[in-house]
Amino acid sequence: FTVGKDREMDLYLAKYDVLGSMAHITMLESIGLIGKDELPLLLDELRNIYGICDRGDFVIEDGVEDVHSQVELMLTRKLGDMGKKIHSGRSRNDQVLVDLKLFTRAALRDIVCQTKTLFDELISKSEEYKDVLMPGYTHLQVAMPSSFGLWFGAYAESLTDDMLYLQAAYRMTNRNPLGSAAGYGSSFPLNRQMTTDLLGFDSMDYNVVNSQNFQIVLLPKECTTGSSIMPHKKNPDVFELIRAKCNKIQALPTQVTLIQNNLPCGYFRDLQIIKEVFLPAFDELKDCLAMCAYIINKIKVRRDILDNPMYDPIFSVEEVNRLAQNGMPFRDAYKKVGLDIEAGNFTPDKNIHHTHEGSIGNLCNDRIQALMQSLLDGFHFEKVDEAESALLAKR
């Protein structure tokens, strides 16, 4: 029931899982977690598995959970305990994500190529029929002369807009999540830049932590509401309203698409209704952003959260990694720590040392700020300001 169609869908990801593992273990060898003599053997076997995937012969056996487990099982059958080491410094989270990103990157490339082919065909038809006139319509009424050249060319031009979206999607996809583990980094001294380069990513995802637990942050009193019967309550109503408003805004593309649904080429009065959903959305979004900035400025964080013994098990990964760094195969270290926790014998070492890019000890905020600045610089707002000022200036 919980697996659903995962095993079937994972076949799409098989060869990308192999590529991700090849980059990951190459990096692990560089930091001493895989032996120099082990790496060539692992890489050769992964290349064999890649060939199986490429031929369409890869299968996930009965009783095997997913593609990641199948690849590791195939390695372990051939190479023994050596195959158990490939998961060191990785979580299912960043492993799944890198597979999806590699798959999406390849799929987007195919779509870009096919879009360019369609574009070329439309331009060719536009040139071929540029002198052939046709009626132009508005409201499905004959309006003005047009041409097949203009008609085909208009659809070709619309594909350039689509190409901008594809480019944005490609840039967002082409970032390396390896090293983020379950979302909080790893205590292994991972070289994330190395896996970024090996897989041809433009950059890495520096920080993929998106969620918060209850009572980890304290909201300002003026931004919460109480209860009529429960005096202890501080409800995050403002954030709940922001969530609802933003969810409503996310529906905007669907609303616009449905309003335009089934309209042929030309102008129709249906399009007037788009203004009613489009124009007010910006005011709502600006209000949400302003309120978020106001609250974030006043948020306080609790500094003593992890003193509570209930959180001791979250340090288990650090212990697994410590054992792996001392030579124990990752899967065996994982099993040992799990048994210690189950027996009540686990005493955590709460001194954690994360150093790789995007981890607790190396946030890379300077790179994130530089990325944001480069994106802001790409808007060239000053060009618009200069043009508008020139128009408004007295002559």
Question: Could you describe each region identified by the protein language model?
Answer:
Residues 168-176, 209-217, 343-348:
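Short conserved catalytic/interaction loops centered on acidic-Pro-aromatic/His motifs
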Residues 196-211, 391-394:
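Short, intrinsically disordered, charge-balanced linker/junction segments flanking boundaries
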Residues 1-185, 189-203, 226, 239-241, ...:
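A helix-coil-helix interface module used to build multimeric assemblies
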Residues 41-44, 210-211, 336-340:
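Short linear loop/turn motifs
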Residues 186-189, 209-243:
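Catalytic cores of enzymes that engage adenine nucleotides and/or redox cofactors via long glycine-rich
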Residues 78, 82, 125-132, 201-202, ...:
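A short secondary-structure junction motif
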Residues 1-20, 230-395:
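Glycine-rich cofactor/substrate-binding loops
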